[in-house]
């Protein structure tokens, strides 16, 4: 997936990180898994959104990528 395929909010933050206005996280996969885990655990969110986040987090955890 390319940045231009992402939603406006993602593209805005991408530009801010690239310009130095927003902090870059070197351990990006761990950051993503933590964020997805928080979404998956949030019972105030719709179950469908939580399941998508849980699926994405599980796939990142099982992938070959490491921070």
Curated annotation (Swiss-Prot):
It holds the Pfam family UPF0253. It comes from the Bacteria. Belongs to the UPF0253 family. This is UPF0253 protein VC_0872. It comes from Vibrio cholerae serotype O1 (strain ATCC 39315 / El Tor Inaba N16961).
């Amino acid at each position: 997936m390319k940045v231009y395929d992402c939603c406006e909010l993602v593209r805005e933050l991408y530009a801010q990180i690239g310009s130095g206005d927003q902090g870059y996280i070197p351990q990006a996969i761990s950051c993503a898994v933590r964020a997805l885990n928080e979404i998956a655990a949030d019972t105030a969110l719709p179950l469908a959104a939580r399941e998508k986040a849980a699926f994405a987090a599980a796939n990142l955890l099982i992938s070959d990528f490491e921070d």
